[in-house]
Amino acid sequence: MGALGDSAYGARGRLIKFSYIVTALISILFSISCICYGIWLLARRSQYAELVSPSLYVDVGRILVIISILSILNYLICFYAIFKEMRCFVTSCAVASIVIAVMLIIGGCIGLNFRDQLTHYTPLNLKMLTSLRELYGTHDMKGITESWDALQSNFKCCGVNGTDNAQIWKTSKWYMHQRAPKLLIPESCCIPSEIERCRSNPFDQDAPPPYYTSTCYEPLQNDLLHVMNVASWLCITNAIVQIIPSVAGCWYSKLIRK
């Protein structure tokens, strides 16, 4: 009875096996949520990467997706190994879970570091101002042009911040290199229902502005800070969730007699 109690078939072994399965399933569900959020981040926020370079937040999104997929595959292999009582594979999968947890923690730290850099050190407003004036609309910087158009359309904003509002477009190379009749602001600044008036005379003082009057710096910064906060803590929490089944897996592998 003592030998049986210390084996995978005893009460302790069955409890550890059950604990592993439950915690692994919880971890899989959490990994699926990480994958969904990472895909959303890459699909809906990666278009602004050209304005924020280095775009570490995109890397965090990739880490969320790729490492979470590896985590799920690892659990599936471990499920098979546990039910077949393949001791070596169970141990390997448990160790792999720890490695995956470390990679997720690294991803979370990258995200938190990005937030700190964006808040205190990265002159995002100056980067945006430079890209608007010098790079928007140039043939070899289509990524910048697309990023600005997506930003202004999606956030319903125009210009950078403060005095560098919609009027700043008249100082840009995009404006200077146009042929007459010139557009004063890009169409991405225009309210869709006012597109014609926005093209012809957007700065008419006798009518409400046909363009977005909010500037883009603060909305973009606040959005990226929020998105990265969620992504970073998803990474770290997923890493913590990985630890419990990895410990249970290592313990269970010691009870397998094969």
Curated annotation (Swiss-Prot):
Keyword Transcription: no
Membrane topology reported for the UniProt record: Multi-pass membrane protein
Record's keyword terms, sorted: Membrane, Transmembrane, Transmembrane helix
Pfam family, one: Tetraspanin
Protein's UniProt name: Tetraspanin-15
The keyword NADP is assigned to this record: no
PANTHER family for this protein: LD03691P, TETRASPANIN
Cytoplasmic-facing ranges: 1-20, 84-93, 245-258
Gene Ontology, cellular component aspect: oxidoreductase complex; plasma membrane
Extracellular side: 42-62, 115-223
Protein encoded by which gene: tsp-15
SUPFAM superfamilies named among the record's database cross-references: Tetraspanin
Function: Plays a role in cuticle biogenesis. In complex with doxa-1 and the dual oxidase bli-3, promotes the generation of reactive oxygen species (ROS) and tyrosine cross-linking of collagen, thus stabilizing cuticular extracellular matrix.
Localization per record: Membrane
InterPro entries assigned: Tetraspanin/Peripherin, Tetraspanin_EC2_sf
Transmembrane segments: 21-41, 63-83, 94-114, 224-244
Species in which this protein is naturally found: Caenorhabditis elegans
Family named by the database record: Belongs to the tetraspanin (TM4SF) family.
Expression by tissue: Expressed in the body wall (hyp7 hypodermal syncitium), pharynx and vulva. Expressed in a punctate pattern along the thick region of the hypodermis.
Biological process terms in GO annotation: collagen and cuticulin-based cuticle development; cuticle development involved in collagen and cuticulin-based cuticle molting cycle; skin epidermis development
Disruption phenotype: Embryonic lethal. Mutants display dumpy and blistered cuticle phenotypes. Blisters contain unidentified cellular material. Resistant to iodide toxicity. RNAi-mediated knockdown results in the lethality of more than 95% of progeny at the larval stage. Most larval arrest occurs at the L4 larval stage and is characterized by body swelling and abnormal epidermal morphology, which includes blistering of the cuticle. The few animals that develop into adults have a distended body shape and/or epidermal blistering.
Assembly behavior: Interacts with doxa-1 and bli-3.
